[in-house]
Amino acid sequence: MSFKEITPQQAWEMMQQGAILVDIRDNMRFAYSHPKGAFHLTNQSFLQFEELADFDSPIIVSCYHGVSSRNVATFLVEQGYKNVFSMIGGFDGWCRAELPIDTTY
């Protein structure tokens, strides 16, 4: 089993249906701005993530440009998560699609 790639617009639509979007960018970038409703997934927050998501939950992985999200998506599949997606274009693609973001500015 592997993950699928989806567009930012598809990710947003899936989030409206209950999918979990995890943002794997660094702490400073995530704190500054991130997709609205995203969970910040780090090594330190993984246990909290495991409490939030079950193995059948749709999980969308977002990074900077859509490259490193593939590695994390593969890792999640290897951990037993069955419904994993990597977001094409990452947060840059999300912003280009003019989808909602949470910011600190």
UniProtKB/Swiss-Prot annotation:
SUPFAM superfamilies linked to this entry: Rhodanese/Cell cycle control phosphatase (SSF52821)
Domain Rhodanese: 15-103
One GO CC annotation: cytoplasm
SMART domains in the record: RHOD
InterPro entries: GlpE_sulfurtransferase, Rhodanese-like_dom, Rhodanese-like_dom_sf, Thiosulf_sulfurTrfase
Active site: C63
Catalysed reactions listed for this entry: thiosulfate + hydrogen cyanide = thiocyanate + sulfite + 2 H(+); thiosulfate + [thioredoxin]-dithiol = [thioredoxin]-disulfide + hydrogen sulfide + sulfite + 2 H(+)
EC number(s) stated in the UniProt entry for this protein: 2.8.1.1
Alphabetical list of Pfam families matching this protein: Rhodanese
GO biological process terms held by the UniProt record: glycerol metabolic process
Keywords: Cytoplasm, Transferase
Top EC class of this enzyme: transferase
MF terms (GO), sorted A to Z: thiosulfate-cyanide sulfurtransferase activity
Localization annotation: Cytoplasm
Family: Belongs to the GlpE family.
Function: Transferase that catalyzes the transfer of sulfur from thiosulfate to thiophilic acceptors such as cyanide or dithiols. May function in a CysM-independent thiosulfate assimilation pathway by catalyzing the conversion of thiosulfate to sulfite, which can then be used for L-cysteine biosynthesis.
Protein name per Swiss-Prot or TrEMBL: Thiosulfate sulfurtransferase GlpE
Originating organism: Haemophilus influenzae (strain PittGG)
